[in-house]
Amino acid sequence: MSTSAAPGKLATTLGANVSSLASKVRSTSSTQQSLMQSVKRIIPPLSSAKHKGQAGRIGIVGGSRDYTGAPFFASMSSMRFGCDMSYTICTPEAGNVIKTYSPDLIVNRLLDASVEWSQVERSVDELFARFHAVVIGPGLGRDEFMQKCAKLCIGLARKHDMYLVVDADGLWLLQNEPDLIKGYKKAILTPNVAEFGRLCDTLGIDCKQEPDSAAKKLAQALEGPTVLEKGPVDRITNGKEVLYVDLQGGLKRCGGQGDVLAGCLGTLAGWAKIYQDENPTLPARSTTTDGDLIAEDRLLLLAGYAASVTARTCSRLAFAKSKRAMLADDLLPEVGRAYEELWGDVQALL
């Protein structure tokens, strides 16, 4: 009797486990669908009634003597994803090169070490007043002058209450001076594995602990900024909630893919600013679900999620065509295709 009961119990147990697994799968799928719908609510609809710039004016701070490709990829990605205007702010020698890449680029060669610092401050401040969001880091470099420029730009972003993305060598500055960004809730940082480890070391966090805990503790230590930790699984956290992106991307790990993500994130951050301006009564905080209005503390969380999903989709589409020969430049034509695959045809928003 016991032998006949055992298979029945086993079947019951297996059935319960399968049911539980199916429930988790449905829950995950439901969560993803909910996140995607929330992101759509931030995207400004296209309209013939709008004028140039109303769908986003984004600044990209980067481009130095040694690096001209990164700001190009970030600027082009921001426009391909949907912002109206993208401005590259760089050194004169980098600007001369970047200008030749595309007539669509607006290149401001304001980071000039040969002029008075007060002139640099004034020129950048005047330009920042136009932006919805700014990305600091692609092609920035680590020399003293460029790091000084990054410090200036972070301060100006805070002065103008602007949404801010800090990437690449902008994170090098923050690992040395984390107080520059502490407490600023309109910032999102995009560290890769090495950059995440250095930031954790600076702030006294064990980066080898359970991954969710490490990411949340870094965001908590920064007291406001959102963190998009890039890796095999991307984690986006504001210190309270953690979102995950594990979509399959391309298998080629060529340089420049992070710049594509940063550019898309810049546009999404700009759209978050537009959404906030159009809805001045946004709640400051929310639960993990979005009501009639998306709470302010979830805007960059959703932007980071959307940028990660988009970058991985671009990489997958580009890799399917180019395989081992894939370069970052191959991702640019895929940004618009990724947008439509993820967020739907543009006509659906008209």
From Swiss-Prot:
This is ATP-dependent (S)-NAD(P)H-hydrate dehydratase. ATP binds at residues 230-234, 249-258. Catalyzes the dehydration of the S-form of NAD(P)HX at the expense of ATP, which is converted to ADP. Together with NAD(P)HX epimerase, which catalyzes the epimerization of the S- and R-forms, the enzyme allows the repair of both epimers of NAD(P)HX, a damaged form of NAD(P)H that is a result of enzymatic or heat-dependent hydration. It comes from the Eukaryota. GO terms for molecular function: ATP binding; ATP-dependent NAD(P)H-hydrate dehydratase activity. One of its GO terms (biological process) is nicotinamide nucleotide metabolic process. It is an enzyme of class 4 (lyase). GO terms for cellular component: cytoplasm. (6S)-NADPHX binds at G139, N192, V193, A194, E195, F196, G197, R198, D259. The keyword Protease does not apply. Keywords: ATP-binding, Cytoplasm, Lyase, NAD, NADP, Nucleotide-binding, Phosphoprotein. It comes from Mycosarcoma maydis (Corn smut fungus). Pfam families: Carb_kinase (PF01256). Its cofactor is Mg(2+). It is found in: Cytoplasm.
